[in-house]
Amino acid sequence: MRHVQAELSPSSEPEAGPSQPPVTQGTLQGGLLMGYSPAGGATSPGVYQVSIFSPSAGVSEPPRALKRPAPSTEGPRELKRGPGLGAREGLPPEEPSTVGLVSPEGLGLGLGVASQHFSHHGLRVVEQGGSATSSWTSGTQSTPWPSSNASCNTLHTRDWAFPDQGGQGCLGESPGPAPSGQLHTLDTDLHNLAQIGGKSPVARVGNGSNPWPRESHGTANGHSPEHTPPGPGPPGPCPTKRRLLPAGEALDVSSEDEGPAPRRRRGTLGCPLAANSSDAKATPFWSHLLPGPKEPVLDPTDRSPMGRRLKGARRLKLSSLRTLRKGPGLLSPPSASPFPTPAVSRTLLGNFEESLLRGRFAPSGHIEGFTAEIGASGSYCPQHVTLPVTVTFFDVSEQNAPAPFLGVVDLNPLGRKGYSVPKVGTIQVTLFNPNQTVVKMFLVTFDFSDMPAAHMTFLRHRLFLVPVGEEGNVSPTHRLLCYLLHLRFRSSRSGRLSLHGDIRLLFSRRSLELDTGLPYELQAVTEAPHNPRYSPLP
């Protein structure tokens, strides 16, 4: 902390120095002691305190000029002066850093002393107190300061005791009294101490006219006017220095004191910085004009692996949304399970029988060697054919129950027309195992005499085990499926009927043996579609 103190001294002998010119009595009506303590070093904050002491109204002492030595905390050090300060003020380099004038109107440390304090915080001057009986005037009269240095380099005090007696009083030499509300100007270097941390010196104000000459408009410190920064504006509030902050940092405008810059919060997303920018300070002012990240535009002709992955991900997302729209009832409520439940695939809808016939279960293995003999009777008897059967077994049993086999007989080797049958008759399909033993013989009667040309339909023949005596009113839960035969029929444009596509069969691996002690018998059920019963060919 720097301390600038102005006080009224008692009647004592002045300390004459070799570089201080004599001051006659009555010349100075008040004094100002300017100085700072170097104990803080260059890293101490730029805070100043100006103390003005005045005695009670009845004390009258002849004015004397005193010179105060520097504090004894450090040895004398050489001050850095600006160009021309030493020659203009007449100070040798070995003088101490604290030089001032003391007004001898009594030492203001006794009883009845009124004081005023001024704290210079950065560039703001705050008056902390005042007294209606305090009186302090400046020294000699000089020319007024240039208007370019009056905005930030002045301290404004008010003399409450003496009225204006003509003329302007400045810190210099003038034989006249000071006016009321006089403007006391401090050295420019004194304010530089608050900005650069005590690197600028405090120069003594000596006798002579206008110790700070007016700077010319042409040059400043040897630089051309176009490279010289503009001076301060008219008197008024001192402008506060503000540094440029990136867009992600928030500027604290509630305090004018200089302090550490606010930290950037983690996770704050600011404007994207340009990688090729060489001016880091100018980046926040134009980087917000850059376009933000956009979703990649999918090119329908893009055949690269990345393009295919993007298209696949987009199709999967659209299909998931479509499934959610069509089947909201298939999803479990969110509160039913702590984990998200995926939507049930529509390919698994239906009963166990439909899932087996359509091949919606993953097969556990295949068995080769099964064959099937196909024959028909009716208005005519076509030739019997024997075709191989592709048998697949599954492992879907959860209670050690026998899982059925699925046999598929492909009719494509018989030609495009398939296996020709009469419109009314009986179809016989005999299944043989690899040992050429009969597994099951299916007999299905049909009547498609009303089937129009170029249409198709199917028949599904089932064999159930049901308790004896309950053939008519047996519930579906009390019957067991043993065998199933699925036949597909199609009529040509000429009206001829034939089997086409394939024939699918369901059968058990071993004979069903019930240990319930109740008699069971086989029950055959043949079903056909209705409403509509026939469908036109695609």
Curated annotation (Swiss-Prot):
Residue spans of biased composition, Low complexity class: 130-148
Pfam families in the record: Chromosome_seg, DUF4210
Annotated InterPro entries: Atos-like_C, Atos-like_cons_dom, ATOS_Transcription_Regulators
This protein's name: Atos homolog protein B
Family label: Belongs to the ATOS family.
Region of interest (Transactivation domain 1 (TAD1)), ranges: 436-444
Record function comment: Transcription regulator that may syncronize transcriptional and translational programs.
PANTHER family: ATOS HOMOLOG PROTEIN B (PTHR13199:SF12), GH03947P (PTHR13199)
Region (Required for macropage invasion): 348-430
Annotated localization: Nucleus
Biased composition (Pro residues): 227-238
Domain of life where this protein originates: Eukaryota
GO CC terms in record: nucleus
Modified residue annotations for Phosphoserine: S254, S255
Keywords for the protein's UniProt record, in alphabetical order: Nucleus, Phosphoprotein
The keyword DNA repair appears for this protein: no
Domain comment, as recorded: The protein contains a transactivation domain (TAD) which may be required for transcriptional activation of a subset of target genes.
Chain residue ranges for the region called Disordered: 1-103, 130-149, 163-185, 199-272
